[in-house]
């Protein structure tokens, strides 16, 4: 991966700063283990059934050029148009325009707004025709009522596209800071495990393929606050996110099971020039499960409506600079030993480990 950019001041009509940059990225996959599935069939939808005849390798390259112009037509006003061009070795060209606005409203308040088109390229497993994933049945789409199924790579996948919008207010007085931002991201071409049968293997298993699916939406509000309780000694910082929506448009299922709200608050204490301490508290809101069955297992066994209730975690750590090159760190996470165990019910999709102690040394040169 390599990148570079140059900033050029421009005096033409208004004060401007022009940014021009370029990026290049190459990803390579060589995973014999994940592509080693061998089946009795001679081929699966044109893909050799024998692992020896399928490549375990894949690669992709992305080359990009971008330009951004920070225009200040008057004091306190900034208009920032931008354009990014990406060329993907697998799927071709993509243009991503953007427009951001910042306007001061008096001495302490600023309003910001922006809109941008963005994309996400498929990963190498999703585009690798050598990668085969097999389910005996429970992981197959609900409309496949018997037998197993294969999920195969698709070299013709298009990138996921999103239109991202936000608008917010910032308030700053000396070292006090507060902000609130509304955001909405509309997605198209979401890459999903396909539910359309593209063929059957010689043994009768259904063949499916990664595909570009329907639309999705993420919408919410973010807020932050910074308060210097004792300037240069004790600072209190808080950020929070409230999710209005996070769903697949076609099913209403959440894109992922996440808290309705999350609050992080930190108390940073600079005790001496070498010694500092931090106490942190995180609150996770209620998490609701999926409501629409997508797999055979969910269809036959039914979906649990069990939600995961709100909970919080507390941690603390201490840092000590032994010298300018060496730092010591010790701490405790999840001080009150809150534990959650993953189960097959509803929103209980992950483990929350209990109390943990840690220590580390960082050397810098």
What kind of feature is each model-predicted range?
Residues 119, 188, 193, 283-297, ...:
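C-terminal beta-signal and adjacent terminal beta-strands/loops
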Residues 6-12, 70-73, 85, 93, ...:
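Residue-level signature of outer-membrane beta-barrel architecture
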Residues 2, 59-63, 93-95, 161-165, ...:
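Residues that define the transmembrane beta-barrel architecture of outer-membrane proteins
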Residues 24-30, 61-63, 83-89, 115-121, ...:
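Transmembrane beta-strands of outer-membrane beta-barrel pores
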Residues 16-22, 79-81, 111-113, 178-180, ...:
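Transmembrane beta-strands of outer-membrane beta-barrel proteins
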Residues 1-91, 102-106, 179, 233-239:
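Face-selective signature of the C-terminal outer-membrane beta-barrel domain
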Residues 72-79, 179-187, 202-293, 324, ...:
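Gram-negative outer-membrane beta-barrel transporters
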Residues 30, 104-112, 142-149, 154-211, ...:
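Membrane-embedded beta-barrel scaffold of Gram-negative outer-membrane proteins
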């Amino acid at each position: 991966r390599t990148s570079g950019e140059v900033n050029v001041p421009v005096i033409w009509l208004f004060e401007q700063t022009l940014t021009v940059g370029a990026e290049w990225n190459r990803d390579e996959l060589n995973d014999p283990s994940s592509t080693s599935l061998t089946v009795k069939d001679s081929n699966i939808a044109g893909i050799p059934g024998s692992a020896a005849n399928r490549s375990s390798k894949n690669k992709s390259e992305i080359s990009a050029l971008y330009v951004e112009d920070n225009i200040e037509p008057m004091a306190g006003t900034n208009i920032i148009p931008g354009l990014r061009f990406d060329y993907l070795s697998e799927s071709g060209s993509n243009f991503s325009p953007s427009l951001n606005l910042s306007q001061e409203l008096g001495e302490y308040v600023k309003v910001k707004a922006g809109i941008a088109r963005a994309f996400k390229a498929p990963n190498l497993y999703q585009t690798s025709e050598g990668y085969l994933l097999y389910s005996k049945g429970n992981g197959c789409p609900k409309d496949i009522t018997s037998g197993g199924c294969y999920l195969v790579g698709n070299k013709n996948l298009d990138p996921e596209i999103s239109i991202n919008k936000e608008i917010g207010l910032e308030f700053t007085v000396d070292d006090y800071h507060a902000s609130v931002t509304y955001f909405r991201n509309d997605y198209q071409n979401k890459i999903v495990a396909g539910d359309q049968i593209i063929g059957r293997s010689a043994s009768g298993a259904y063949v499916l393929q990664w595909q570009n699916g329907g639309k999705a939406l993420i919408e919410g509000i973010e807020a932050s606050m910074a308060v210097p309780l004792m300037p240069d000694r004790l600072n209190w910082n808080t950020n929070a996110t409230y999710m209005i929506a996070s769903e697949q448009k076609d099913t209403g299922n959440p894109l992922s099971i996440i808290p309705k709200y999350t609050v992080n608050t930190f108390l940073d204490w600079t005790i001496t020039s070498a010694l500092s301490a931090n106490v942190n508290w995180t609150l996770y809101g209620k998490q609701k499960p999926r409501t629409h069955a997508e797999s055979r297992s969910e269809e036959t066994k039914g979906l649990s409506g069990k939600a995961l209730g709100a909970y919080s975690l507390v941690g603390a750590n201490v840092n000590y600079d032994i010298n300018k090159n060496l730092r010591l760190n010790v701490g405790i996470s999840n001080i009150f030993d809150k534990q959650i165990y993953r189960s097959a019910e509803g929103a209980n999709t992950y483990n929350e480990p209990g109390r943990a102690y840690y220590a580390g040394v960082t050397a810098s040169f």
